Swiss-Prot record:
PANTHER family documented for this protein: DNA-DIRECTED RNA POLYMERASE SUBUNIT OMEGA
Domain of life of the organism encoding this protein: Bacteria
GO annotation terms (biological process): DNA-templated transcription
Keywords of this entry: DNA-directed RNA polymerase, Nucleotidyltransferase, Transcription, Transferase
Described function: Promotes RNA polymerase assembly. Latches the N- and C-terminal regions of the beta' subunit thereby facilitating its interaction with the beta and alpha subunits.
Key word Protein biosynthesis present: no
Top EC class, one word: transferase
CC per GO annotation: DNA-directed RNA polymerase complex
Protein's name in the database: DNA-directed RNA polymerase subunit omega
Binding partners and assembly: The RNAP catalytic core consists of 2 alpha, 1 beta, 1 beta' and 1 omega subunit. When a sigma factor is associated with the core the holoenzyme is formed, which can initiate transcription.
Annotated family: Belongs to the RNA polymerase subunit omega family.
Gene Ontology molecular function, alphabetical: DNA binding; DNA-directed RNA polymerase activity
Organism annotation: Rickettsia felis (strain ATCC VR-1525 / URRWXCal2) (Rickettsia azadi)
Length: 126
């Protein structure tokens, strides 16, 4: 972050951490708009520098940028509740073809197995 630009931005957004998060969000938006040809690419400046300069100049609404950031972090999908019990029973019927051997809670066969640790060296579980 350029020191002069960051110091100018501190007048608008006193918290540096908040400034970094908001400037990053705005830089990502700028980068997206440049890639989709919605705005012209400014010469020699990268999106983070442009976003800091625009925040320092007051050309960007900080409140709107915060709200945009919050909306982008929210979960987009909703979990649908199970309306009737018959649907869950249908799911159980889909797994009836599996033999009982596959559906077990017995892990005693793991005692004799060989495992590989993260370094790639073999070792036996004892």
């Amino acid at each position: 972050m350029a020191r002069i630009t960051a110091e100018d931005c501190n007048k608008i957004i006193p918290d540096r951490f908040r400034l970094v998060v908001l400037a990053t969000r705005y830089a990502k938006l700028l980068n997206y708009k440049v890639e989709t040809n919605q705005i012209k690419k400014e010469k020699r400046d990268k999106p983070p520098v442009i976003s800091l300069r625009r925040i320092a100049a007051g050309k960007v609404s900080v409140e709107q940028l915060e709200q945009d950031l919050i909306n982008s972090l929210r979960t987009k999908t909703m979990i649908e509740p199970i309306v009737n019990q018959d649907e869950s029973e249908d799911i159980e019927e889909k797994f009836e073809y599996l033999p009982e051997v596959c559906i077990t809670e017995d892990y005693s066969d793991l005692d004799d197995q060989i495992f590989i640790d993260e370094t790639g060296d073999d070792f036996e579980d004892k």
